[in-house]
Amino acid sequence: MIRQLIFISVFAATAAMAALAQNVTGTVTCGGAGVSGVAVSDGINVVTTDKQGRYALQTDKANGYVFISIPRGYTVDMADGFNPQFWQKLSDAKVETAEVHNFKLTYSPADDYVMIIGADSHLARRIGDRKTYKNGYIASLKYEKEKAAESQLPTYSMILGDLTWDNFWYANKYTLRNFMDDQRKMHYPVPLFPVIGNHDNDPAVPHSANTDFLAAKLWRDVVCPNYYSYNPGKVHYVVLDNIVYQNDTLPAGKKARKGVWGQRNYNAAVTEQQINWLRQDLALVDKQMPVVVCSHIPTFRINRNFSTFGSLQNYKELASCFDGFKNVHFVSGHTHVNFNAHPSEYPHIMEHNIAAICASWWITGKLTGTDMCTDGSPAGYSRWTVRGDSIEWK
């Protein structure tokens, strides 16, 4: 009897510890039925749902969210018509507090669609940028959506970083929160999967060992996780944050704009935490499936001799994550020019650097009436037509 009581006590204690360890749980369902095999993550660990659509995650809650990788054949609710609800904020920072977060999917079997890829909107409440953005980019998105609908194709979009301009967050009172509000007011017409850029980090955060994490807090609070994945059709999309924000102390005698603490400088790299998450994410992906890697700074660039070189500090480590994959596309912004690169070292990888929505920070349009990037290419975006695992771009 004593042995039985000891066994029961030990079992109960073990079960309690297990429940405490798995402090974020929930379900992923469609029409009330569980969806199995859906990747769920806190940005550090990746788990998948069981046959009943249930998941259990052990998390330190450091990132403050939980998200799913939207699976093929499904979509999620779009808040305000454009904001995909694939993530949820955690409600309590205490690790010992258990939380339940459920996700609902809608069946959407389309493997064919249009993806509009823009970059560098740089909205900052200056020189009429928001009006030009609405009359130009938003109007173009509406046109693209209508044209795609004629072929019964859904339309998605992404903006590859620098949605805002950190130098004017406080001087012009225009932060990421204002950007998201503007998209609501302008009726952004298609789902938007955003990417963080260097100008989307909070310049008021002082330089420290934790600057990069703290400077991205507003992004994580009001936009979405700064790295995640999703699966429209037969293509796997990965969004990465390749900005390691430093914001070093200003040199003596140099002054910054209102609210800006430091130099707003950064390193171009993907953190080890993201690399570890990415390897877990890709382990769930068929290597025959095309992968599109979305980030702000190009991983590969072209020099004056038209030779391709790696531009991230740890580009080799990042590229190694895609060993064995056959068809990998990197898409990026940041440069305000337009180019494609084929790194000879990685024949399965192609870089697409997309010209800026704002052209040359909205200045050429203001001065000349023509929005033109620094290489002479027009302001705009790239339109990708995806049919199954076939991708065409313009």
Question: What function would you assign to each model-found segment?
Answer:
Residues 44-60:
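Short, acidic Ser/Thr/Gly-rich low-complexity loop/linker segments typical of extracellular
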Residues 1-22:
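Bacterial Sec-dependent N-terminal signal peptides
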Residues 282-303:
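Short acidic, glycine-rich surface-loop motifs adjacent to enzyme active sites
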Residues 120, 161-162, 197-198, 296, ...:
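Active-site glycine-centered loops adjacent to acidic/histidine catalytic or metal-binding residues
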